[in-house]
């Protein structure tokens, strides 16, 4: 998971994706025990934006320790998805955001099953784009596929007691 010259829009110096300024990475310390995660992973984010519509993407990543072959560690994408803000509460009744207002969105990843081995890290990457995997959101609120312009969205993920953004991992207890 490192940019390179083959990446659309990437420029030197190439960096790990988690270190990009448009990616917010949450990562555990190295795990002290094997940890099994099996089922749907749910992410609840409190977010705000300068735009009336925008996207939030999440990736669950198994971060292997550094090795001779991978001096920065190996970063295995397990599952990822996207949530368009206008559809945060309903696919049939879209609702635009009010710029600057905090709202809670729920992002559910497809079911997965992985044993994060001792010494590995669990990482969740949050961004507003995962192009070309998902289409680009013009952030205008215009009808999907019929936009006439694009605007930049400055997005914020809020944390803390008033805005408890969180990840719900289905951890299977060791036997």
Residue ranges and their predicted role:
Residues 1-175:
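Intrinsically disordered, low-complexity Ser/Thr/Gly-rich stretches
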């Amino acid at each position: 998971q490192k940019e390179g010259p083959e990446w659309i829009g990437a420029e030197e110096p190439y960096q790990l994706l988690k270190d990009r300024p448009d990616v917010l990475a949450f990562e555990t310390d190295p795990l002290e025990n094997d940890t099994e995660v099996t089922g749907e992973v749910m992410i609840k984010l409190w977010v705000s934006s300068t735009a009336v519509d925008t996207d939030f993407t999440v990736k669950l990543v198994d971060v292997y320790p550094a090795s001779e072959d991978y001096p920065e560690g190996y970063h295995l994408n397990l599952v990822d998805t996207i949530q368009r803000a206008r559809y945060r509460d309903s696919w049939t009744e879209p609702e635009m955001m009010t710029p600057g207002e905090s709202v809670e969105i729920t992002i559910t990843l497809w079911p997965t099953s992985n044993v994060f081995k001792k010494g590995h890290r669990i990482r969740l990457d949050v961004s507003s784009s995962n192009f070309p995997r998902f289409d680009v959101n013009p952030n205008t609120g215009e009808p999907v596929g019929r936009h006439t312009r694009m605007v930049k969205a400055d997005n914020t993920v809020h944390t803390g007691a008033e805005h408890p953004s969180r990840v719900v991992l289905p951890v299977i207890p060791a036997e």
